[in-house]
């Protein structure tokens, strides 16, 4: 998962009474787009409870812009440089268009493609996923409606910054999260857990937990260390990450700590 950067993909008009800060998807060619910065972001992934031992993986996010389209490459590598997992993301203006997951450790591949519509209620997400990448092209699509504040991991950081005032005042903020291996979105809620200092910086600790009790049994709560001063960057993230860990000859989901190099 490795949550780093976030904002919603939806029409630019929120429902009446909504607190959502929806970003306009109609941007000029010279406007700064939400997901184009930083051009390069790196991080290190450690075992839970230790950020000083041997790293498990290295993370690198690279963003390039062509007109109003942003292409993002997210790579997860072993310390020796070998790729463990790769994600590709495409945004048009500030809206998600395409998300692709290559789980190179287990040979799986999946995608989520957004079909926008002038009628926001008719926008859709099309999912494909195969445990065998060689059979990916023959997998059947699974489709669900695109709801407001639907995110992928790359969109979480900006999403939290956009809802900073609510979170800082103790309000809960909800989202739908795209999980390609499940070919669906899952509801999550963010809330402030505490305020503290992190390496001399004033920070908030935010907790992200599934809205469903069923999903809560499968995924532990996730935690974000976010600087209190603008631009409210995610400094550290603890929870489910994209690469897996080999244990007794089997690949298992990995909960880990990711420290970002801001």
Placement of each model-derived feature along the sequence:
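Solvent-exposed helix/loop surface patches that form functional interfaces
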Residues: 36-38, 122-202
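Bacterial N-terminal signal peptides
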Residues: 1-4
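Acidic, serine/threonine-rich low-complexity disordered tracts
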Residues: 12-93, 99-118, 172-262
């Amino acid at each position: 998962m490795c949550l780093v950067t976030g904002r919603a993909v939806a029409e630019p008009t929120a429902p009446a009474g909504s607190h959502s800060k929806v970003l306009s998807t109609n941007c000029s060619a010279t406007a700064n787009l939400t997901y184009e910065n930083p051009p390069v972001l790196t991080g290190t992934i450690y075992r839970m409870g230790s950020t000083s031992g041997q790293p498990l993986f290295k993370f690198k996010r690279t963003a390039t812009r062509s007109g109003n389209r942003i292409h993002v490459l997210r790579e997860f590598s072993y310390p020796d440089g070998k790729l463990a997992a790769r994600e590709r993301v495409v945004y048009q203006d500030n809206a998600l268009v395409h998300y692709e997951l290559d789980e190179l450790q287990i040979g799986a591949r999946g995608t989520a493609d957004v079909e926008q519509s002038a009628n926001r209620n008719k926008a859709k997400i099309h999912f494909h996923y195969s445990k065998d990448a060689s059979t990916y092209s023959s997998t059947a699509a699974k489709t669900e409606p695109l709801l407001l504040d639907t995110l992928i991991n790359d969109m979480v950081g900006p999403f939290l910054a956009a809802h900073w005032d609510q979170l800082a005042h103790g309000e809960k903020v909800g989202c739908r999260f795209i999980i390609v291996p499940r070919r669906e979105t899952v509801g999550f809620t963010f809330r402030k857990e505490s305020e503290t200092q992190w390496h001399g910086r004033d920070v908030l600790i935010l907790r992200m937990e599934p809205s469903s009790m069923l999903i809560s049994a499968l995924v532990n709560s996730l935690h974000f260390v976010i600087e209190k001063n603008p631009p409210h960057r995610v400094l550290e993230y603890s929870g489910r990450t994209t690469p897996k860990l080999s244990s007794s000859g089997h690949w298992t989901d990995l909960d880990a700590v990711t420290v970002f190099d801001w």
